[in-house]
């Protein structure tokens, strides 16, 4: 055996050739160890016999444990099985990219013809499946029972022409004995790379069942290769369940080809226009019959980075999943993270738009983090791709859902059929922070069909902080049902992001109705928004109605621009208290003035008959923040209710 000199062993009964280059590597105990590369060539498209893929796998499996193999293809075309292939039981690189003429799309198809799909069994850890179309299997197209397996460049559920040829089960199934796999590959973090296309299968596209530490990047799941047409899987696009932990769907890397710089922010916060970048490691998960991505079954620590869910590949048109875009159910400590650059206006996002259910549903799940995402907005930040229901729904007993963060970790939830955000049932510890609800990020109106945010939850300890809720069909913010324990401070509702021009909601800036009680509007939280500003709306700045009671409104501007100097009035008046509302307070004696209610078309404050025991105290009504006249067009206060207290207001 000569160092550096390959030699060949012909094995006529099994395959065309096995090439074994032997290279001296190191002397150990007076001998030499050699790195051995075992390559088998597939030379025909038959289901079995000499030169077939079946014969190659049988040879691999007959080898001693610990050896690695490569199966190359000297042919292209369709292998139609007559019986199921044996599982792969040794580390094997099945390299259909080696087929002559390969240029980025599969040239070899494994038509399972109703037989079992391809399975990587125990003993095959470290295997690779490259550039193969796997279709028409009974059950799953590809099953991973071993770890550290790479899938790249494959069609799973499509034929060589990219047409539906679905496997009857899941496209790719990763079992609890398999972990740390690469489903998709894009090491250069290059824009436009399509790794695997997993579409047209009878059940889910990709299932992680008790599997952890996997990375899923640059795949098309539920669409054609171009990401322009639906070839949906029969279930979800991706299902992560049964204690599947710490999987990353997508990624945050980005390389600017013009500079070669990775993750290149555009400058310091506030000095450069935000840049919106299509995330190259993200997956397109669209067109599936059920939900786009499901995280369930106590799975934890999973992260979605930079995926487009429910849109075409460019993120600007709908190619919706039949259910929710993302559904997190009974699975805590998971996250959708679009952006990690806190100090730069580099905006990097998941786009979860165009779906037939909600964009995101968080149900009975705790500590979910949602930062830097678009729900209902297109990737271009200038048009809408509506989710049919809410942008975000938080329900059940979900605790501590964090939607947003410091700039630029906020979200856009705009253009959706119902609400931008809805929080219901007993959800508690919820926060929306730096959300654009009803408008594009730093831009114009993109109305949600109902409210910017609707909270009916009885769970308490929910916070609406530093949001712009403007441009919605109905209200900017609504607290309804038995909502309690909600703090709203500080926000803009009815104006643009800078708070200096009108961007009206079709209803009220803030509506408190139903039996909502014990909520606080205003406070001492400060950020780029100095206080609540409810101005420019087509009805009232603040309306309290129904049987709402024990709600406090203070430290808010109602009818002015954000600095409280000039008028940007609400169309019907500043504050309306109606129905049977009781024991509510517009103002208190902690701050002077408590509220600024000025510049509105209509009366400053109206209390209709049927209301009782409400207080309007210590406010500027018809004056700006400096105490100078800024009148409402009607009288300062009209009180038609019973035992309402009007006291110490400056008019």
Segments and roles (model prediction):
Residues 26-147, 152, 158-169, 173, ...:
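N-terminal, post-signal-peptide segments of secreted/periplasmic proteins
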Residues 89-90, 123-124, 129, 146-147, ...:
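Parallel beta-helix/beta-solenoid
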Residues 1-11:
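Bacterial N-terminal signal peptides that target proteins for export
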Residues 170, 203-204, 236, 290-291, ...:
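Consensus positions within tandem repeat domains that build extended binding/scaffold surfaces
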